[in-house]
UniProtKB/Swiss-Prot annotation:
Name this protein carries in UniProt: Multifunctional CCA protein
GO biological process, one term: tRNA 3'-terminal CCA addition
Catalytic reaction list: a tRNA precursor + 2 CTP + ATP = a tRNA with a 3' CCA end + 3 diphosphate; a tRNA with a 3' CCA end + 2 CTP + ATP = a tRNA with a 3' CCACCA end + 3 diphosphate
Subunit structure of this chain's protein: Monomer. Can also form homodimers and oligomers.
Cofactors required: Mg(2+); Ni(2+)
Binding site for CTP: G8, R11, R91, R138, R141
Annotated GO MF terms: ATP binding; CCA tRNA nucleotidyltransferase activity; cyclic-nucleotide phosphodiesterase activity; magnesium ion binding; phosphatase activity; tRNA binding
Cofactor comment: Magnesium is required for nucleotidyltransferase activity.
Length: 410
């Protein structure tokens, strides 16, 4: 019985990057032996155990044979005779197929993952890559994480991904897994690499058709020197990751704020009048399909509808700005205003030549919201107002507070 550290922990150590959870593989053991040593079985589909003290996951070495469509269609063999090399062969990428002996620290690298780490290449381990559609998503997500370190996708891996997209294999992806990988990608430093990798593989049209439809749609060059809305979307996603590192909530709203531009009739290009309203329906469809959590949905819809209003904040009347705050539910959910400001700043700076531009609208929005938020119903009730009178007086007082804050900030 031999134990090896495998996967991301080994990879990240070699990259000198912070490591997450540690995963272990056990060679030459069966379930009875593991339980005899105090390990607790937890795997439903695979022979996985929790260490009795550390709680870390230990999996028996296994092979997987394709038996059906999708990522669940596999027959697993975890016989004690399965070798470490056979176990590593089933893994997705060479950089994840490196093992380290728990006792000696020696690396076991039969598929040259260390060489690919050195060359900064993301490459599939073997032909079985095409058997699991989730690996297309994982390739894109790893690129979102590793592209800032100089990684590129191996040409043969990119070719396999295109084959998988063309074969219809991606149709078997379950919504929950798509959302999981998208959310993780939006938490990475370069989400554009996720989008670009999938788009180049012709997989984005299957996974996120609402986003894929933005590519090739022109915008006015005086406002968008990058012209292509798809490229703008990539830049906005990266800017959101820069402004709010690791914040997938802001990242998702940034990703989906311009979906309406794909619905602009071509004869109206490059203008996109009312795209902020047109974008709500495809955004809601995307959220329904992927079962997106409510907090993500709500902020994304707010950003989609309101980003142009925030851009022209100085032009809004005090009452109009108050109405915007009400639509954002900003008096019950005050955190939304800072989030909305970040999305709008990412939109404004996610353009060629504007990456370092100032965005005073964001700070102004937060300041005016804070002034309105300082007015509360309890104070008005203490003055003897009751029922509808309180609501009317509260609105009037908050609008007055916005006006006063504007005069001070002018």
């Amino acid at each position: 019985m031999k134990i090896y550290l495998v996967g991301g922990a080994v990879r990240d150590a070699l990259l000198e990057q912070p490591a997450g959870d540690r995963d272990w593989v056990v060679v030459g053991a069966d379930q009875a032996q593991m339980e005899a040593q105090g390990f607790k079985p937890v795997g439903k589909d695979f022979p996985v155990f929790l260490h009795p003290r550390s709680g870390e996951e230990y999996a028996l070495a296994r092979t997987e044979r394709k038996s059906g469509r999708g990522y669940r269609g596999f027959v697993v063999d975890a016989d004690p005779s399965v070798t470490l090399e056979e176990d590593l062969l089933r893994r997705d990428f060479t950089i994840n197929a490196i093992a380290r002996d728990e006792e000696t620290g020696e690396l076991f690298d039969p598929y040259n993952g260390a060489r690919d780490l050195q060359a900064r290449v993301l490459r599939h381990v073997g032909p079985a890559f095409v058997e699991d559609p989730v690996r297309v998503l994982r390739a894109a997500r790893f690129m979102a994480r590793l592209a800032p370190l100089g990684f590129t996708l191996a040409a043969d891996t990119a070719a396999l991904m295109r084959e998988m997209a063309a074969s219809g294999e991606l149709d078997s992806l379950v919504p929950e897994r798509v959302w999981q990988e998208l959310r993780r990608a939006l938490s990475c430093a370069q989400p554009s690499a996720f989008l670009r990798t999938l788009h180049d593989a012709d997989a984005l049209r299957v996974i996120l058709p609402e986003v894929d439809a933005l590519y090739g749609v022109p915008q006015r060059a005086e406002f968008h020197p990058e012209v292509d809305t798809g490229i703008h979307q990539e830049m906005v996603s990266d800017m959101a990751a820069r402004l709010a590192p690791g914040d997938a909530l802001v990242g998702f709203a940034a990703l989906t704020h311009d979906l309406g531009k794909a619905l602009t009739p071509p004869e109206e290009w490059p203008r996109h009048v009312m795209h902020e309203q047109r974008g709500v329906a495809p955004l809601q469809a995307l959220c329904e399909r992927l079962k997106v959590p409510q907090d993500f949905r709500q902020l994304a819809i707010i950003a989609c509808r309101e980003h142009l209003n925030v851009h022209r904040l100085a032009e809004l009347r005090d009452r109009t700005l108050h109405e915007l705050l009400v639509r954002c539910d900003a008096f019950r959910r005050p955190e939304r205003i800072a989030q909305l400001a970040l999305v709008c700043e990412a939109d404004k700076r996610g353009r060629l030549g504007s990456e370092e531009a100032a965005y005073p609208q964001g700070e102004a929005l937060k300041r005016l919201h804070a002034a309105a938020l300082a007015i509360n119903a309890r104070d008005l009730a203490a003055e003897g107002l009751q029922g509808p009178q309180i609501g009317e007086a509260l609105t009037k007082a908050r609008i007055a507070a916005i006006a006063a804050a504007r005069r001070i900030g002018a």
